[in-house]
């Protein structure tokens, strides 16, 4: 009688405990996390492009248009309404939430993060918000790993590993770069670099990248070609570039925190919408290539041949910062 009262999930868990070893099951879960995370990344990109194409289909998206004064405000309003009335939780700072889950919540991430970040970021970016899709999809992937592990009653150390698998799969799936996903997880989330953790991370990253390749083709997100072979004499310039980028990253982080502090003092959400939306709309109206993700601008930089193109890209980079 007891056996009959067990749910299907409980029977699966009991069967797994009796027939599949813990380490083997972790590898199976990491494979599943890679698949689910890859499809989540594909869905996010699909929604962003569909919204963006629908809104900009009737005019040249690279030229100034008065609709650019409207779209970002509408996008921020819709995303804010969605978060306040549907999600009813703070979903900002995706990577920070993952680190908090690892350090304070034993790898447990709320279920709504599986879909809430994807929908909110798709609306924001599709309507022109100059933000990246990386942090939302990393949070989504980590939430997939955490909740999949929770379903099968895995211990907290395994949950933290699956959180890392989701993050690795997210980066690998959206960029088609499994090594980038692995390095991101090891460096940013600081998952233990042991053989027992490295193999699941690799499986998730490679699986996600493979699914992305199968569904969208082998074309890389950033397309470029090298006209000349790399020479050792260029190493000092590469080092200087790394130092400069590090300083820019530091400035960007502190500037973002300062702006958040200013907006945090505004208790009225409509004031935040008005100030933030208007500033973003004006910038996009003046500099249309700021609309959306910005990957087209990066490709322009990688393949640009004229001085005018380079000037445009550099000016846009300064505006982004």
Report the location of each language-model feature.
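Alpha-helical transmembrane segments and immediately membrane-proximal extracytoplasmic
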Residues: 1-319
